[in-house]
């Protein structure tokens, strides 16, 4: 009945408290805490990658099964990203952040103590369900407390930390693995979760007053999501972003094989893969921000895709002609990440502008689709290709072609 009564109303979107209820500034300590919350997910994804082979040997399972500990985490992470924002709008930011961090910490301890592979898989699922809370709600906290240039500055700082985490995590994880064994990685994740839990409990106050909260209607939320999913142009744009970004998923899902078996490096050398990836993304993002007002959106997308095509073709050509080795095997990945960073922001804006009055809901779904495709590629496609650098390169090129086709179809729908 609630769905029927509200089906003709505007789609649900997050509305920040009125200016009179916002603080005039976000404290530096709060910014540091929020940045720390954005690290929870990337650390849980990337820190244990150097331990893949050791986990398989310890539990006597194949690399393909170990791969599913990443896939299960990503699927769980993507699923609850749809609901964390809505839950925090109804019950407040603080309870959801604290609850998700508590569950994440317990799940990390469970993974560290897992007596069998089945238990490890189960705890990774719970980890994934809990890890998205901080990443999603931290952005809402910024919107509660600040607006305009200050909000942009805080979000930029958070995104910088979010971008650095995947570069640091596998290096730290490799050191922990070599020094203390693979279980120490999950003890580290548990310690970080506990640190964030204590810090948020003591220093992060509630930012959404009770007067600004919404009633929780699961049926209405589901109906509103369905309205967005029925829009073909939005779906095409979201898929074009997700498939292009899944080039990362292919290499992250194959990271252990790519670094250790293909490149012949040690567990402590994962920086050879992740630092170029993150560097390309960071440089591309900085350039995109500087030229955003000077370059037309369609031109920005075209340049980004052109760079990605050159990178993907160079990657295929190199791995066809030569045996993969550093630094040449990772330079095309850096260039691909650079092009992706140029195209993705504009594609994201175009996707959200399909629903100009409901960008919050559209953003949640776009993030969900991106993470879902990332999980599918890293969990199902990567195991089919990760024995060969040439196959991985061809997989990235195939995904890029699909992304370009989706973007062109979305452009045609806009003209129609």
Name the predicted role of every residue range.
Residues 51-80:
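Extracellular/periplasmic helix-loop-helix junction of adjacent transmembrane segments
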Residues 123-164:
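Cytoplasmic helix-loop-helix junction between adjacent transmembrane helices
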Residues 207-237:
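Juxtamembrane intracellular "pre-TM" segments in multi-pass secondary transporters
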Residues 58-60, 92, 113-119, 130, ...:
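Helix-breaking motifs and short loop linkers at transmembrane-helix boundaries and internal kinks
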Residues 119, 148, 156-202:
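Helix-loop-helix hairpin linking two adjacent transmembrane segments in secondary transporters
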Residues 95-109, 300-315:
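Structural signature of the two symmetry-related core transmembrane helices
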């Amino acid at each position: 009945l609630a769905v029927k009564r509200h089906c003709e109303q505007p789609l649900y979107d997050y509305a920040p408290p009125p200016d009179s209820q916002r603080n005039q500034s976000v404290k530096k300590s709060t910014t540091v805490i929020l940045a720390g919350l954005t690290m929870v997910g990337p650390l849980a994804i990337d820190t244990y990658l150097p331990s893949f082979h050791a986990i398989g040997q310890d539990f006597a399972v194949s690399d393909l099964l170990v791969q599913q500990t990443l896939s299960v985490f990503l699927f769980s992470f993507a699923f609850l990203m749809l609901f964390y924002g809505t839950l925090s709008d109804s019950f407040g930011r603080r309870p959801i952040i604290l609850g998700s961090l508590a569950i994440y910490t317990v799940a990390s301890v469970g993974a560290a103590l897992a007596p069998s592979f089945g238990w490890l898989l189960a705890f990774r699922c719970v980890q994934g369900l809990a890890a998205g809370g901080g990443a999603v709600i931290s952005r809402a906290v910024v919107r509660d407390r600040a607006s305009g240039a200050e909000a942009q500055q805080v979000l930029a700082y958070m995104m910088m930390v979010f971008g650095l985490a995947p570069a640091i995590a596998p290096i730290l994880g490799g050191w922990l693995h070599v020094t203390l064994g693979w279980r120490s990685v999950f003890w580290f994740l548990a310690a970080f979760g506990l640190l964030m839990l204590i810090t948020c409990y003591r220093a992060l106050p509630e930012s959404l007053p009770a007067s600004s909260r919404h009633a929780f209607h699961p049926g209405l939320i589901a109906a509103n999501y369905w309205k967005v999913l029925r829009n073909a142009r939005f779906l095409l744009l979201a898929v074009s972003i997700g498939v292009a970004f899944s080039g990362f998923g292919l290499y992250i899902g194959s990271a252990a094989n790519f670094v250790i078996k293909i490149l012949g490096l040690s567990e402590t050398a994962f920086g050879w893969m992740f630092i170029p990836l993150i560097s390309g993304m960071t440089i591309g993002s900085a350039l995109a921000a500087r030229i955003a007002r000077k370059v037309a959106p369609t031109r920005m997308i075209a340049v980004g895709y052109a760079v990605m095509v050159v990178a993907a073709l160079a990657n295929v050509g190199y791995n066809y002609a030569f045996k993969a080795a550093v630094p040449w095997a990772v330079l095309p990945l850096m260039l691909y990440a650079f092009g992706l960073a140029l195209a993705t922001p504009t594609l994201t804006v175009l996707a959200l502008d399909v629903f100009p009055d409901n960008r919050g809901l559209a953003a949640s779904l776009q993030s969900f689709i991106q993470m879902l495709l990332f999980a599918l590629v890293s969990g199902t496609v990567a195991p089919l290709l990760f024995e060969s650098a040439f196959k991985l390169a061809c997989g990235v090129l195939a995904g890029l072609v699909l992304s370009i086709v989706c973007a062109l179809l979305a452009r045609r729908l806009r003209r129609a």
